[in-house]
Amino acid sequence: MAQVQGKIVQCIGAVVDVEFPRNAMPKVFDALKLDGSALTLEVQQLLGDGVVRTIALGSSDGLRRGLMVSNTGNPITVPVGKATLGRIMDVLGNPIDERGPVDQALTAPIHRKAPAYDELSPSQELLETGIKVIDLISPFAKGGKVGLFGGAGVGKTVNMMELINNIAKGHGGLSVFAGVGERTREGNDFYHEMSDAGVVNQESLNDSKVAMVYGQMNEPPGNRLRVALTGLTMAEAFRDEGKDVLFFVDNIYRYTLAGTEVSALLGRMPSAVGYQPTLAEEMGRLQERITSTKVGSITSIQAVYVPADDLTDPSPATTFAHLDSTVVLSRDIASLGIYPAVDPLDSTSRQLDPQVVGEEHYKVAREVQGTLQRYKELRDIIAILGMDELAPEDKLTVARARKIQRFLSQPFHVAEVFTGAPGKYVSLAETIRGFKMICAGECDHLPEQAFYMVGTIDEAFEKAKKLAA
């Protein structure tokens, strides 16, 4: 069937209006190709009288009225499957790593329905991360959704990289990394890190374990809006082959922000704080597809930027509803020099249930949170009256809480190059044992400095000996 042709009638920035014959109008989300150019337009609105409003997925420089546009009749399709492994692609699935074309034998549209309810497969299996505070307070479920929330510069990307280091490298399945509106430098660093670790196999790309899709900060809003869907489509294809997939998104907030830009360009009335009126629906459309079926699983880890450290902002607040575990990074904890700067009182997980994690893990986690909460309440009294005015049991609580706080810190493998301290992976059993000993008072004789930036509790005892020497 010959492709229907239309012509550009208006071009305002990234928004392009195209006129088609009235009896052959394209559908919403159809991809249109500009004749003689690589530019793709995606239909967003039908304006009537044969005119459709589209968003340019690429620079609209040089476009003018009267240029001919062809309707492909389908949504944007991207390559999926083995051909994408070890490659860096853009929103349209074109390679940007200068290593030749990506094999297009298998392709899939980026818009599709979420799996039906009866196809879903809830999982109670835990995913060990090797990061103490996460494994103890907000354990991850295999096939679950995790959000890393934090303001600017508190360590979302470093935490994300450490999770990739600890899970993806030791994980038998495949990973997909979607860089949505983040720094190009970070995308480049990630690629080289994956190459050094052998996750990207330079000799035989098809034996790699990760596919990368980037639509970074410098891209037009259309690219940043759709790049998360492109990455998700690739992850879904691996899942439907029966694989266990890790899907990393950095950063989901930029997806919302791109939606805001597009919404404003399309002339929609903004809602709260200037966000698009369709914020919840757009977020739901993406998040409902990130799910595990009876065939395979997608475990997703998403970094979520929190504007002005305000968790009640509509964008992070909308994201909260879709997640199984939330890891909240706090500027106050970062300012104490405790990294990862995870707030153990704000972070939550559906998996932290005695029937899932076991009675011992649950009790230790709740005791740790209880001790820290009591310390938080006592801090005002300490600030006004000093430590000496506290009751003996409160003094003990404060001492233990400060040790717990420091023991929640941990040297990261990915930060080794900056700190010089070798990274530590701590198993869940060791994590529980360590915190149980602190809560039980078996470490009351150790100085609190011995707990700072160590792995297991045994290392804290070793460090205490060195400090005493």
UniProtKB/Swiss-Prot annotation:
Catalytic activity, reaction form: ATP + H2O + 4 H(+)(in) = ADP + phosphate + 5 H(+)(out)
Top EC class of this enzyme: translocase
Entry's EC annotation: 7.1.2.2
Pfam families: ATP-synt_ab, ATP-synt_ab_N, ATP-synt_VA_C
Similarity comment: family membership: Belongs to the ATPase alpha/beta chains family.
Keywords, alphabetical: ATP synthesis, ATP-binding, Cell inner membrane, Cell membrane, CF(1), Hydrogen ion transport, Ion transport, Membrane, Nucleotide-binding, Translocase, Transport
InterPro entries hit by this protein: AAA+_ATPase, ATP-synt_VA_C, ATP_synth_F1_bsu, ATPase_a/bsu_AS, ATPase_alpha/beta_chains, ATPase_F1/V1/A1_a/bsu_N, ATPase_F1/V1/A1_a/bsu_N_sf, ATPase_F1/V1/A1_a/bsu_nucl-bd
Any one cellular-component term (Gene Ontology): proton-transporting ATP synthase complex
Protein's recorded name: ATP synthase subunit beta
Membrane topology label: Peripheral membrane protein
Binding site for ATP: G150, G151, A152, G153, V154, G155, K156, T157
Predominant cellular place of this UniProt entry's protein: membrane
Compartments reported by the entry: Cell inner membrane
A molecular function GO annotation: ATP hydrolysis activity
Gene: atpD
Assembly description: F-type ATPases have 2 components, CF(1) - the catalytic core - and CF(0) - the membrane proton channel. CF(1) has five subunits: alpha(3), beta(3), gamma(1), delta(1), epsilon(1). CF(0) has three main subunits: a(1), b(2) and c(9-12). The alpha and beta chains form an alternating ring which encloses part of the gamma chain. CF(1) is attached to CF(0) by a central stalk formed by the gamma and epsilon chains, while a peripheral stalk is formed by the delta and b chains.
Annotated function: Produces ATP from ADP in the presence of a proton gradient across the membrane. The catalytic sites are hosted primarily by the beta subunits.
Database matches in PROSITE patterns: ATPASE_ALPHA_BETA (PS00152)
